[in-house]
Amino acid sequence: MSILTRWLLIPPVNARLIGRYRDYRRHGASAFSATLGCFWMILAWIFIPLEHPRWQRIRAEHKNLYPHINASRPRPLDPVRYLIQTCWLLIGASRKETPKPRRRAFSGLQNIRGRYHQWMNELPERVSHKTQHLDEKKELGHLSAGARRLILGIIVTFSLILALICVTQPFNPLAQFIFLMLLWGGALIVRRMPGRFSALMLIVLSLTVSCRYIWWRYTSTLNWDDPVSLVCGLILLFAETYAWIVLVLGYFQVVWPLNRQPVPLPKDMSLWPSVDIFVPTYNEDLNVVKNTIYASLGIDWPKDKLNIWILDDGGREEFRQFAQNVGVKYIARTTHEHAKAGNINNALKYAKGEFVSIFDCDHVPTRSFLQMTVGWFLKEKQLAMMQTPHHFFSPDPFERNLGRFRKTPNEGTLFYGLVQDGNDMWDATFFCGSCAVIRRKPLDEIGGIAVETVTEDAHTSLRLHRRGYTSAYMRIPQAAGLATESLSAHIGQRIRWARGMVQIFRLDNPLTGKGLKFAQRLCYVNAMFHFLSGIPRLIFLTAPLAFLLLHAYIIYAPALMIALFVLPHMIHASLTNSKIQGKYRHSFWSEIYETVLAWYIAPPTLVALINPHKGKFNVTAKGGLVEEEYVDWVISRPYIFLVLLNLVGVAVGIWRYFYGPPTEMLTVVVSMVWVFYNLIVLGGAVAVSVESKQVRRSHRVEMTMPAAIAREDGHLFSCTVQDFSDGGLGIKINGQAQILEGQKVNLLLKRGQQEYVFPTQVARVMGNEVGLKLMPLTTQQHIDFVQCTFARADTWALWQDSYPEDKPLESLLDILKLGFRGYRHLAEFAPSSVKGIFRVLTSLVSWVVSFIPRRPERSETAQPSDQALAQQ
């Protein structure tokens, strides 16, 4: 190259070009790519005035405007990427506050859209104002109860007839399309309305479309002339029916969350009841249990009415000694029947409090726990149980392995953020085994904690409800604990839950027997059905292969009709769930959670249906470490098998598209789209199975709290605590940090009006951000530290609000990236014999993805460059 350029170019230009070539090579570009990059640069200098200030601003903002193109390491087709990204920036990603004259039409449309949103936001208030007289005058109040029931019956009957017509009326493709457009238009109109009315309307529209789909599936899509197609079609229809039932029950369960607030306690503390706090443990490390006991000692409650018990099913002497040192009671059984339930029932023989509060040994209660919960028991004499959320300050395997901690709602957020709140509306709150208060008298009436199943908590609440007692749920987190440390431990925990809920379904079926209200029966059944999702999920992951591999028509209908029925059913359900669940579960993430668990919960739930007494209780390990990143090949084996099976389907589908009957081409395309979606979800499951490092023994908790540090010479600095753990803190000093690494300082924290001092050592200094390591603490200092940090009343309350709102399209893009990430991990960790194949496939996909335009990474200086780009 140097000889050619020396002959063609003058020396200064040649020297600069050679320097650019060497720079490209230094950054990893191949010789061909570097040569081509120099050629493109010459063409750019010839045809584009790069010295112009506008182009200079664009070049300065290259990293923001073209985030996927590395200017220091060119690739052969970078000009195509530049062209696509530039068109995207000009057409699709422009965000100018002041529209240009040539876009007045678009500006007018935006004004109309703004007025429409304003009108929709004001609509609920106007409707409330217009209908206020109905509440004031009680226009039906003069009618007898029988007449009001008659009117209600007529309205319900008319509504059911209308719904039946909408569901069963057959349409040709055009009429079906028009009908769907009307419903879709209605959904788009109401989805932005605030309040619960929009959610109710979306539920009605979604149920209309979904019920119509199920009716169509049962009446028009089974091929009775082909045994293979009939069997495969019935299997898929079984899975779809299950999904439809869960959808309907789920809407019912969360249609009107109660959002219960605390009831204040009497000012006279003599009226406050006595409470026993149980902390059961079996094989956990003492360090895991200590924080729970220390926090319990600081609960705001009269000390003469509070008894704390360590229930040690391991019979360990160090636990007995620890209990004696801190002044709590200790019980150890000689026998260990019925695991945790038996441990608690044994303690009930000795405890005499009016209420019992149970915490898993890693769940650290806040100081306000009892004051926030017990007030309801004094107000409602039939209230037997009050449950609060299980909040986790460490990432679960999904969050840690995917790097999504506090960025996406975790798996349990939906249940504790919305489902339990919805259950509370129907008086069907479940006891979850920890972070709860139970009235002792009803608990004694049912014989203590249920021992017949491995999910003793849910079974206990079912028995309380059968006795006519009520339950309650408060969504405000009042305790926090450790999430499972590995995917295998997480799956083991879910297997136990799944087996236990199916055991309850068989042994104490909520649909039968006395004592339950209809709504309670539905809520319990939906909880049990949730854990039966394994087999239906596996069916969905393999269903399109029936047509591609076996030529079985699982949905015996034209591809156009399949699209007109299937897509609206899925889109309406996704839109409705996004509206209802958006703060607690982002769109499409349920697919990942269910896929990871499906293979493992399917066998135990099936066994429990057949033999409910089979199975044993297993304790979930907490507080472990993951020393190195690795793929859990044992856990991921089923996912890889399903990936390979679907890849075979892709290969056969491609062959059938080019060489099969022309009449089946559209059906092949539909099946291939389904297969590719399944591959994305399975890739996400593989990504979860890559265990990330977890080398901290003490998890850091992010929070903002005022504090101060004092040097040995007495000089004080005000600071803000940014995070803390059981072993240290991260602080930000307000001002200049005149502190050195290794220096010993005292940390001053406040709890209420009391100030506490803790000895620390400076572990790191980065500007005004300082890392502190706690020096060895006395028992009392450790108690004080836990109560100043983990047990603060406001520590966990705002975590839920930190999650971003759900945006379905962005969430779908996240799942696409996640799926691709899983296959990249397979390429990285696969055995050498197959690593080459995975690398070729992932490199091919990466190459295709590199052409997709990206939204610019906005910065403070990006605006002028964006404007300059639009003017070229």
From Swiss-Prot:
Protein keywords: c-di-GMP, Cell inner membrane, Cell membrane, Cellulose biosynthesis, Glycosyltransferase, Membrane, Transferase, Transmembrane, Transmembrane helix
Catalytic subdomain B as annotated region, ranges: 441-501
Domain PilZ: 694-790
NCBIfam families: CelA (TIGR03030), PRK11498.1 (NF008558)
Membrane topology classification: Multi-pass membrane protein
Organism taxonomic ancestry: Bacteria, Pseudomonadati, Pseudomonadota, Gammaproteobacteria, Enterobacterales
Name of the protein in its database record: Cellulose synthase catalytic subunit [UDP-forming]
Active site per UniProt: 313, 457
